[in-house]
UniProtKB/Swiss-Prot annotation:
GO biological process: DNA replication, removal of RNA primer; mismatch repair
Reactions the enzyme catalyzes: Endonucleolytic cleavage to 5'-phosphomonoester
Domain RNase H type-2: 9-236
Claim: Secreted is one of the keywords in the record: no
Superkingdom: Bacteria
Subcellular location field: Cytoplasm
Function: Endonuclease that specifically degrades the RNA of RNA-DNA hybrids.
Similarity field: Belongs to the RNase HII family. RnhC subfamily.
UniProt name for this protein: Ribonuclease HIII
Pfam families registered for this protein in UniProt: RNase_HII (PF01351)
Record-level GO cellular component terms: cytoplasm; ribonuclease H2 complex
InterPro entries, per database record: RNase_HII/HIII (IPR001352), RNase_HII/HIII_dom (IPR024567), RNaseH-like_sf (IPR012337), RNaseH_sf (IPR036397)
Transmembrane feature ranges: none
Amino acid sequence: MQHANTTALYLIGSDESGKGDSFGGIAVSAVLIHKDKINTLHQIGVGDSKQFNDYQIKALVPKIKAAVHDQVTLSVDAKTYNQLVQSFKNVNVMLTFLHCKVYHQLLQQNKLTAQQCDISIDEFANVKLFTQYTQKLTSLQNELKELVIPNHFLIRGESYSKVIAAASILARAAFIAQMEQLSHQYGVQFPKGSAHGIVEALHLLKTKRQFHKFAQYSAVCKTTFKNVASFLKQLA
């Protein structure tokens, strides 16, 4: 954890969803709220997204959007996810890029600087590693002029920070929508997670949708996951 920005008038929280799922890409969200309004998130029932089912998540989305000052969500499909991982050579560098991107958009939309905000992230890397990842990004891309480093890195942050919890719910809602769109497009009920039913679903795509090429699978699943990569080797 870094030092809190005690003079900040605004709080920002960010989290991602889909990171551990074999199918689909990933969604990253950040929310901005005035420090004096943080109790509103408690009043509307914001909590750890893992405690809510999909229906409850969807019901909370409009309430959160109405309660916060602003929010940004990036829904990255599987094809783009795989391209980014290949480009950045490291999943955590890619995650750093996506979190920095939602911070950048949120600050830009509201004409704020990072110094005016107290920023919290659900920790996927500690501050030292996150800083190293931003240094790698500086040499890899020029899209973001400023790479913001959060003030707080919280393990299971959605359990301790309402602003992270709100971002977590928005990210999960976006990932749910992404998975529902995939299922509708391909006529296959894609399993969640990265263990149960994954190989069976990959086989189903082969038999039901005539998937025979790596590029076809890369549009629906994370090709670097071990069980997916093992299956894809059989296509060669």
